[in-house]
Each structure stands twice: as C-alpha cells, then as structure tokens.
Amino acid sequence: MYPNMKRIFVYITLPLLLVCTAVSAQETVSPLDSVDLGNLFRLQANGNPDKCRAIFEKSPEVDIANALYGQFSGLLVENGYDTYDSNQAKRKLALRLHGHTPLLLVDGISRSLDDIDGIEIDKVEVLKDAAASALYGVKGGDGVVSITTKRGKDSPLKVTAKYQYGFATPFRAPEFADAYTYGFLVNEARMLDGLPAKYNEAELFALYSGQYPYAYPNVNWWDEVYRDHGDNHQAEFTFMGGSRNFRYFAAVDYLKEDFLYKKATADDRYNANHYDNRLGIRANVDVNITESTMMKINVKARLAEFNRGNYSDRIENTLYYLPSAAFPVKQADGTYGGTSQYGAVNPVAQMQERGQKLYSQTKVLADMLLRQDLGVFVEGLSADVNVAFDYIGRLSEEAKKEFRYSELVSTVAAQGDSSYILSDQLYYGTDSKTVSFSHWFSSLEMKMELQTRLNWERNFGAHHVDAHAAYRQRSWILSGQNNSSKTQEILGSVSYNWKKRFFADVVVNYSGSAYMPKDKRFHWYPAVSLAAIVLDGDPYLKVYGSAGLSGSDGDLRHELWRQNYVSGNSYYFGGNGGTSYSGRTEGDMAAVTLTPELSRRATFGIDLGLFRKRLAINAEGFMEDRRNILIYPSNISEVIGVDVNEQSIGENTYKGIDLSVAWNDRHGDFDYGLYANGGWLFTKVIEDGQAYQMYDYLYRKGNPVGQCYGLEVIGIFQNQMEINNSPQQTFGAVLPGDLKYRDQNGDGIIDSQDRVKMFGSYKPLLNFGFGLHAGYKNFKVYADFQGVTGVTISLLGSPLYSPLRSSTTISQTFLDREVTWAPGREAYATMPRLTTQESSNNYRDNSLWYRDGSFIKLRNVGISYTIPKKALKLCDATVSLTGTNLFSLDNIRFADPEQLDAYYPSTRVVWAGVKFNF
C-alpha cells in the first residue's frame, strides 16, 4: 500500500460517516434532491441529446468503451494508437467525436474512461452543439461526452449480485510459414537479391524432415507463446436504497482477466504469468441536510494490477518477425535457443526466464456537490460548490533474472544417399541464477477541480428563465517536469423558454490555459442556441440550431512560447592546456503564434416523433472551422538560422450529418425495438504550413484531413532492359521484380515529386451502428452491429506484408493470399519479388499497399431468461449468454481491419452469466 493511502482513506471516509450520522434523524423533504450532476447548466435550446442507459446492463465488457460501439451518431470508438501503455498487454480504446477527442465528464467532473466501470453508469450523453461546447471553454472545443453515475432512491434496500465467465479466443490469428517453406523462399529471395542461397539441398531436406531438430528446427512460435483461449472472470455487486433524506448507491466490481499467453512456470521464485486484476468500489450518497441544503458525495476507489514477464518489449514484436527455422525453443543440453544474429529474443525464454514485472495502480476519486437554496433572499436563487480531488499512484515491482542461450552452427552435407551434419555449439549470455528484486513509484498523479455556481430559476407566467454564473478551475499534476495542466474559467449562461415551446440559450465563457504566457492566457468563447417545438403531439417536431466558439488546449505543452538556448560550440581560454568553456546558442524558435485551437461551430437539427413517438428520428448537420492548429510549418525559410518549433497556424474544416432512427413498440407480453444511426464526416485542410511546391498536386491544402498520399504503381519491372528504359529510380537499387511507378511530372526521375493523393483518408467518411432487441415475457434477445466505410488503411502497417525483409519471417497468411514475382510467375504476380533487404523502393507509401478499410462487425449479441422471484422464493435470477466481436464483414479478411500491426490479438469473447436481484 502506498504510504499516504491510509491518510487519504481517512480524509475521504470520515466526513462521509459524519454526514451520514448527522442526517440520519432528519425527516424533512428537500426540494433540491433532483439535481442532475450530468446536466447542471440545463441548456434547453438544443436537440434531445444522444442518450443511452441500457447498454452497460447488457454488454459485459472489460473496457467500457466497447459498449459504446455504434450507439451514438458521430461518436467513433477506435484503437487508441496514441494511447499505448507499455504496462498493458492490450491497446486502449479511444473516443473520437467528429474527428476530435472529446472531453469526458463523470458526474460533471473531467475524468477518463479508466476511472469508471460499466456497473456504475446510469446514462451517457453526447453533447455536440455549440452552446454545450462553449460551457467548457478551452476544454470544450472537441465536444463533450457526459457520463452520469447511478444514485440512490427513496426505497428499501435493493441488492444485485452478478457473475460472468468469459471465454476468449483469438480473432483471425496469423499463421506463419513452416521451416521448409521459409528456407525455400529465403533461398529464392536471396537469389533475386543477387546473393548466394542460405540453405543447400541437404539442409532444406533437414528442415522438411525434422531430422536435426536442434540444428534445423521447425518451431511454431505462435503456438509456443499462446494457448487457444483466455479466461475472464467478473463479479459485480450493487446496493441501492435510502430514505427521503438519505439515499445511497454502492457498487463493487471485480475483474480477473487471464490472457491468451501460456502459463509461465519455469521458476517458482516469481510469477511471470500474464493477468489483469481490477477491483472497483463506488459509493454515491445524497443527503438532505436541511430543507434548503443538499449534499452529494461520490467516492470511487480502484485497485488494479497487471502482471507479466520481465521482457523489454511487447512479445508480439518478436512473434511476428522471428522465423520458424531461427533456433529451437531449447537445445539438447537444456539451454534456450538463440543465435548471434537474433540475440536473446527467444520468446519463450523472454516470458519465463527474465523474471516478473508487476504494475499496481491505486485510484481514489472523490467529489462533492453542496447546494444551498437561497430562495429566502431572492426567489429561485441557489448556490453550488462542487469540489473534486483525485489521487492516482502507480507502483512498479520487478524480479529480474538473465538466462543463457546457445546456437548450433551447423552444416549438412550429402554423402551418397545419406547425409551427415557438422555442428559447433556456441554459448551466449549468462544464467544469473539469483533473482534481484526492486520496486519504485512509476508516477504520482493528482487532479483537483473546483466549481462554484449561482443558479437562478423563475417562472413569469408563460415565461421561464434559468440563469447560471460560475467559476471553474482545474489542476492536473503528474510527477516529472512540465507535466501539469491548469485552466481557469468564468462563465455564464441564460436559458429562456416560452410555454416550453420556444427556447433560447446564451453562453459566455472566459477561459484560460496555463500553457499560454500570462498576457495571452485568456480568451472569450460565446455561443447562442435557439429551438422551437413546432408540433407537440403526434407527430412531434422540434427544430433547433446553435452557433458559437470554443477552444482546445489538448495539443499544447509548457514552454512552447519561450525562446530556449542550448549548449553550443566550445571556446578555449589560455594557451596550451587552456580551459574549454561551452557556449550557448539558440534552440528551436519559440512558438510566437501559440494560442489554443479555436473551434467556430454551427449546428442545425430536428427531432421528429411519429406514431405516438414509437418512431423517433434525429437529424443534425454541423459545420466547424478549426483554427490555430499546432503544426510544424515547412514554409519558413532556413535563412533564419534556427530550427522552427511548432506554430499555431493550421486550419481545417469539418462538416457532417448525424442521423439516428429508432422504433420501439410493445404488444402485450412482446416488446421489440430497432435502431440505426450514422455519422458522415467531411473534412478539408485549409492551411498546414506546407512549403512551396513545384506542382499543384503536391499540395495538401484542399484535401481531406488524413488524406493518403503515395506513388502510383503501374506494374512490376520484368527485366533489366525495362529498368534501363524507364525513368531514373531514386529509392535505392532496383532489380527485376521491383515495383514500377508513374512519372507524374514527366521529368524522367521517380522521386518524392511524384507522390499524389490516392484512395481516401485514414479517417472514416461514415461511422454507423444498427441493432435490434426483442423480449417475450421473461426472454430477451438483442444484437448490435457497428461499422465504418470510406476509410483507407495501409498494409505497410501489417508485419504480415513485410515478408523476409531484414532477416524476418514470412507468414502463411501472406502466401495463401498473394503471389510474389519470380521468373515463371510473372503473369500472375500480385506482389513484388521477395527480398531479404530493406527494399526502400517497394516498401513505401504507394497504391499497392492501400486498401479499403471498411467493415461491419457484430459487436454484441445475447440472449437471457429471467426466473421470477415466485419460483425461487428468495429473489429473481437472470441467466444470460452473450457474444462480443464475433464476426466481421470486410475486405481485409486475414486480420482485424482495426488492428493490422504486431500487437496482442483481437479477441472474440463468449460470456455466460447469472444475475440475482434481491
């Protein structure tokens, strides 16, 4: 346990117990107990926000972001390539709202997805209009995802207990060539490289026959490291109830995830098995202290540990590149296999013999809202104080050990009808025998947030006014230098409606970021929104629109605006034996244009309800001009004599349409529902600081954000004569079998001036989801699908499409799908020749490697049955069977289109669970 954890526990729990004791005898009903922590400012002139309540009840996800796939128009869940955590086996997921990373709020406090478990969530809202964004000033420009946790009710105690077991299997696991196939093809590649063969005929036969398993092994490294399934265990408990003056909700969630890796049992002095343990505890308390005073206290504690072997990098970085013939798992004498060429990369030894790494994380998140009704002074007036404090500590523990490995340097020669082998065993490394243990704090993190508000709400006949004035400050401090982030805001909002038919909101935010110099720190972010309910019956029609400004400091860093000086050349004072003094010189040029990104946003939409609102339709269009984007400009002349730092000069535009349709109906004991939603996103680069280009097609301006560029492949060189008669090639030596490119500018040279835009963007044009649910009496079924289209991915991101390069392996997956060029295969080759070299000519961005990355996935499907309480006497029970990520329709087929690189494999999981309601 961390040294300060006991103290923090006392600081948080003691006031909570005192409050509970003080109010236990109160019987007065407070009019303030309906405060919605997820909607404290109560803007009215917008559409019905995208809202979802039931998804976390039906979706047994280890990562709650999985449950959000396809549930909200415009919200994309994707692999977080920029959120890799080396302490975890799996890549985290990230949210993208209209191409940006939205601000995530939990009960009105800025937090992360890692801070909450699905069992705690009451509702999720996606706020996309300009007025909602302006409320959060310099943090609101990327949109807002607001999560509200469950709260207690004036009711007897209700208890739920749930257990689920998840059976995980790899989704499209790769297959790699066996030793003989590898040996045969590496000989072919070396021949095409103009190099001698690596294996003679007798050695190839040895690889095929397994006659000499230590000198010429055939190892399926994937099967040596992975088992055929992983196991997940999840247990959840909730407690809800209370009186009119004291209400509570508590939850306990435990998850143990045993990964696909095989058990590591080589040394009983440490545990090198891969597992992830998480324990989450939440307590939400609502207290009516007096008739005019209300308090909400939320406390979340999360303990997590991730354990793995003490290898230096992801084990997949070895599995995807190590040939099956490289070396055996172990030699005959028991030493681990390895070579002087590959070093100590034996993945089995790395997992079992290097020791253990255990990462522990403790989170304590606490926030409190105190609301005082001031109606005795001014009718409709109230005041809020909202305080949050988060403490996150990360501890690393290590057991370290080294291992010895060896190789057999062998030659097989033919002797008549038989063969003989000559071997020399070479040893490397040392077996440390002893295990050293150490531990250290990886990081300490503190977040503090303070919000104070004055609220005024009055009715004047048919007129209703709701106004707020607030001050907000946030502080995030991470151990290390220049790792803090601080903001301050003063904001106000006024909402008006007439007979709940016509609505108007005005928001003004004056917000500043500590990343900026003091004289340029604060900026104004105003917004206005209007709405009208045109039809308030059947049918129902509401139209709304908004326009305003908001900001984002997410890409800023400390000291970018400051001119720094770094060590320069030295100068000697004195004669022989004089003293050298280091000089100083200008570092990167200061970001003189530094300012937070500015979002100028406008939205317009409709909410439509038909057939007694069984059919609900929402359509919303938006336009955003995004300015002051931080980029590295290349259009600043080098005559200034220093390197150029990032500057806030970029500009992009984002336009799109979000559409959602839902139908829900009931006939007696049968109910059902259908839904579909989609978000279209059109982007354009307006300014990116690109230097002057000789040809218009080289400019990125006017193209979509994330547009793919590359050389246009027009064929494969068939012979040296064709190479000689072609334009000059500048990407390394070119041989028959290499890719042939179009000379776009006709200058007789193939170089970077011939890159053109091709295919589409890395950002999807359309993100969509659809699904259904049905129930008959105690039976329920559901299915959720999600997909994207209009997105381009590159096979260069997959190690399976880099066969044999730089002494790596070749995958059977690649061989089953493609035909490489070689003499005799020219007519039907789909890929360039095999090579053991780097081949910078072939393996660069070009039209051969880009592929359509569209897909449709079955994200969730499930069936459940509830056994009523009258049958069990004590409680009712629900048994369920659920599948996640079961299949994908796409053009890639050999891998998960969302994850082509060398990483822990995607998994499909089948869950079986039982839930008791007491």
Please state what every model-predicted region is:
Residues 108, 127-130, 139-143, 229-231, ...:
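Short, glycine/acidic-rich beta->alpha junctions
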Residues 284-289, 293, 299-303, 312, ...:
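Extracellular/periplasmic, surface-exposed regions of secreted and cell-surface proteins
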Residues 172, 176-222, 322-352, 399-445, ...:
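Flexible glycine-rich, low-complexity coil/linker segments exposed to the extracellular/periplasmic environment
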Residues 9-16, 381:
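Sec-dependent signal peptide hydrophobic core
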Residues 647-764, 775-778, 786-791, 795-797:
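Gram-negative outer-membrane beta-barrel transporters
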Residues 104, 496, 744, 774:
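Short aromatic-centered micro-motifs
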Residues 330-334, 733, 788-878, 883:
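Extracytoplasmic gating/loop element in the C-terminal half of outer-membrane beta-barrel translocons
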Residues 2, 8, 17, 23-103, ...:
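Membrane-proximal, glycine/serine-rich, low-complexity loop/turn segments characteristic
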